Amino acid sequence: MKPILSCSDVDFTYQNSPAPTLRDVALTVQPGECVLLCGRSGCGKTTFSRLLNGLAPAFYPGALAGQCTAAGLAAGEAAIEDYVPQVGSVFQNPKTQYFNVDTTAELAFPCENSGLPPEAIRARVTETARKFHIEPLMGRSVFKLSGGEKQQVAFAAACMLSPKLLVLDEPTSNLDAAAITRMHDMVATMKQCGVTVVLAEHRLAWITDLVDRYFYFADGALTAQWTAAEFAALPPERLTEYGLRGRTLDACRAEITVKQCRECLGAPMLTLENVTLGYDKKNPLRTLPNLAFGAGEIVGLMGRNGIGKTTLARTLCGLMKPLGGKICWHGRPANEKQRLHNSFLVMQDVNYQLFSDSVQEEILLGAAHPECCDEVMQALRLAGLADRHPMSLSGGQRQRVVVAAAMLSDKPLILLDEPTSGLDWGSMQQVGRLMQALKAQGKTLLVITHDEELAAAWCDRVITLS
C-alpha cells in the first residue's frame, strides 16, 4: 500500500532563524493510521504539522530541504489551495481558524470556497452535524460557545470536504474532561471512516486507545518511534526521561478527590462573601458561596468549560467588578484598583500579553526583582531563547515566558489561567516547582486548570465549580 505521508531527509529553517527547526526527518504513515507526534515543547511537532497541511512554507516562510509528501501533495511545491480538500486542520486555539460568526456558516464555509452547489452544502452541513452529534450547536453564535464547543465546531468544519488526512495540533490543551471525551469520539469517528489522523499532543491519556504509532521528536529530529504495544510497555520512568505525560489519569483523579475536601490553609488573605459573577446584572453567570484563600497556598480551580472560572479570576484580580457581594483583602473590602495592584494574571491566551521584541525584555517588563531573571529563565528552559522574539516561539514556550514574568512580578496574588496549556511533562513540573517557591514566599496562587496531572501533583487543595 502506498503511504499517505512520506518524508525523507526533511530539514526546515524558518526565515530569519539561525538554526533549523526540523533536521533529517524521515518517516512514512499508511492510510487509515492514527499517529501521534510527541516530545518536549519546541521540539518541532508544530512545524512538522505545518509541512503536512501546507502552511509551511506558504504562510510560515522558510527554507525546506528534502521531500515531504502528504496526501499526494509535495511540501514547498503544491499550491496552498490544493491542500484544502485533501488535508483538514484543527489548531490549538480554534479562534484562529474561524471565518464566520455563526456555527452553520462556519461549517458551510469550506464547501462554499470550493464552489459546491447550495443544496449539496446544506446536505453536508446536516450530515456532518449528525455524524459528530453537534446538532444543538448549529445556528449558534461562535462568540457564545464554550472552549470545548468551539473546538468541536472547528473539527467538524475541518471534515466538511472529506479530507484524506487530518492534522490536529494540541487539540485538547484548553479543554475540560467532558470536552476531551467528545474530541476523542470525533477522532474515533474519522478513523473508522478510514481517514488518516496525525496528532501533535502532550496529553496522552485521552487518545492512547486510538493511536497506532508514536513518533518522538527532540530538537527538531525524529529520535524514536514506537508501535502502540511498544509504547504501552514503556515503564513510567522512561516516559519521564522523555518528558512525556502519563498514559492514564486514574491516580491523579483519586488525588484530586482528596484535595477537594480540604479547607483554606492558614489565615485568609483573600475572602469572597456571596459574590455574584457576570457581565450583566440581568443575566448573572453565578453566585459563589463564601470562599477563602490563604497566604502561602496553591489552590486549583477546576470545572467544565464555560462554568465561570476565568470570570472569577478576572474579578479577583480587579479586571472586572462583581455584580454583587463583597471581596476582602486581609479582612478589608478591596476595590478593583486595590485588587489589580496586588495581583498578576497569566491569561489563557498569552498572545494578548506579549509586548516586547525579545524574550528577556518581555520577562523583565514590570519585574520587581530583575536580578532573578537568569535564574527563572534557566529553570523554565528559556535561557537559550533570550534574544528571540516571543511571537517566534512555540505555544508552550510563549506560555513559559509569561509565567516567568509572573514569577518576577512580586505580586502577593498570582492567578494562572491554564498555565500548563501546551506544556510537556518537564515544563509542567518546572512550573509546579516555581509555584512551590512562590508559596514558600507567602504568596497565594489560584490556578485555573483542566490539567489533572498539575492539580494532583502541585495544588494544596482543589475547588471544583459545578
Language-model features: locations:
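H-loop/switch region of ABC-family ATPase nucleotide-binding domains
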Residues: 201-202, 449-450
